[in-house]
Regions:
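N-terminal cationic and glycine-rich segments that engage phosphates or anionic surfaces
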Residues: 1-58, 64
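Amphipathic alpha-helical coiled-coil segments
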Residues: 59-73
């Protein structure tokens, strides 16, 4: 069980806006970068692919973190 989170109305709005941006815009941008990097060929030795994968992991992790905070607010 997660601890109760306390947010100001402004803090709540900021997190909701960030979550919306990550889900609606950032995810698509990262997916496009991944697709473009995969089209370049070998992904094992492609730094752009690795960078995009790392960014995807960060974005998905941030989405999960915000969703958890909002669920416990």
């Amino acid at each position: 069980m997660h601890e109760q989170e306390y947010l100001t109305p402004q803090g709540l709005k900021k997190l909701e806006d960030e979550l919306d941006f990550l889900k609606s815009t950032r995810r698509a941008e990262v997916a496009k970068r991944l697709h473009e990097a995969m089209e370049e060929g070998e992904v094992e030795e492609n730094p752009e692919y690795e960078d995009a994968k790392n960014e995807q992991a960060f974005v998905e992790g941030r989405i999960l973190t915000i969703e958890t905070i909002l669920a416990n607010a």
